[in-house]
């Protein structure tokens, strides 16, 4: 189930949903799984992907394969879902792999790293490159098999009590930043904080942190960050295209019939596309509403971007010298990134640059 099977299974989703294989489905046993999400139920975008996944599995199996979806904190804490899958507390988790870089930095390569791939490039690396193969080899060490479970697209750069005008403003900044990016923020003089999405607002409101990032306008507006920190930065250089994953225990997955395995993969493919579409469709209006309500947008200064890039590349070299898992996967990732960046510089960036300079 590598590369092009994602596309094949996405097509299978339509075939099975249309009832083209009732005999195959009806012959299957009843299955009940539990899914633990790392996200709050209030976010119909990022949490919603798990609902889409579970719904499609149910539909394509004729109701014989049911997955109950549980938000962060219901069954497991947001950052405890991988352990939950490993020990069999739940069969599947929906999460951002980079949350677990403390287990091994290589987890971040399955999600997002600073100045990494954008969402289209990430999906391309997974399906047509070596991404899915390499990450599955790595995740097997943790008794997990992964299926792509959505992408937010390029993110914003977070909410700040005071705008960042230069590198000097990064010094001592208590910043809630997701996953692996905290390592770079720390090298830049900041103080990274790893806080689940549902707890960020309270931390900002109480002044426990100076700044926080989550995803983008739609989610951030729902979480109310604009009420406690008026300055909104861009771009989110640490998350050009963060991929979410469905992590399934290898024993649970191996116990499924071939037909159920195909349904799981097809349902994940639908959820993957659905999440990106939701973000792309909902962020524009949310951004307009935020600005109309007093949010102040600012671009990260050049010295901040250049320092972040320099420190990121140095960090990757340091990790490659110490972690053979990272070295193997990152070497392939970096080559793919270089090739993609060269191509996107012409057709994609050329078109986007012109379009964004026009008035519609």
Language-model-derived ranges and their functions:
Residues 2-19, 24-122, 132-360:
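N-terminal secretory/targeting leader peptides
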Residues 127-131:
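Core domains of carbohydrate- and sulfate-ester-processing enzymes
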């Amino acid at each position: 189930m590598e590369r092009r099977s994602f596309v094949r299974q996405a097509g299978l989703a339509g075939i099975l949903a249309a009832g083209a294989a009732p005999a195959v489905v009806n012959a299957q046993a009843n299955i009940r799984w539990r899914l633990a999400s790392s996200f709050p139920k209030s976010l119909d975008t990022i949490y919603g992907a798990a609902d889409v996944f579970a719904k499609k599995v149910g539909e394509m199996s004729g109701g014989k394969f049911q997955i109950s979806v549980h938000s962060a904190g219901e069954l497991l804490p947001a950052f405890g879902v991988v352990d939950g899958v490993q020990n069999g507390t739940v069969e599947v988790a929906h999460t951002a792999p980079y949350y677990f870089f403390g287990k091994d930095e290589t987890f971040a390569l399955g999600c997002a790293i600073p100045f990494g791939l954008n969402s289209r490039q990430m999906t391309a690396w997974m399906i047509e490159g070596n991404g899915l193969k390499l990450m599955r080899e790595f995740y097997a060490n943790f008794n997990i098999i992964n299926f792509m479970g959505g992408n937010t697209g390029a993110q914003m750069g977070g909410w700040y009590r005071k705008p960042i005008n230069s590198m000097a403003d990064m010094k001592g900044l208590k910043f809630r930043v997701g996953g692996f990016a905290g390592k770079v923020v720390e090298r830049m003089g900041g103080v990274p904080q790893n806080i689940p999405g549902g707890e960020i607002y309270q931390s900002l409101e109480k002044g426990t942190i100076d700044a926080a990032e989550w995803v983008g306008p739609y989610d951030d507006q729902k979480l109310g960050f604009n009420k406690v920190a008026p300055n909104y930065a861009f771009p989110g250089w640490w998350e050009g295209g963060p991929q979410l994953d469905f992590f399934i225990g290898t024993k649970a997955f191996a116990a499924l019939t071939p037909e159920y395995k195909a349904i799981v993969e097809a349902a994940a493919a639908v959820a993957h596309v659905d999440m990106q579409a939701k973000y792309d469709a909902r962020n524009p209006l949310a951004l307009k509403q935020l600005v109309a309500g007093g949010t102040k947008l600012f671009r990260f200064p050049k010295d901040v971007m250049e320092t972040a890039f320099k420190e990121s590349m140095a960090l990757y070299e340091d990790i490659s010298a110490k972690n053979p898992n990272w070295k193997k996967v990152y070497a392939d990732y970096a080559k793919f990134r270089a090739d993609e960046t060269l191509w996107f510089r012409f057709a994609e960036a050329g078109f986007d640059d012109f379009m964004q300079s026009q008035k519609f």
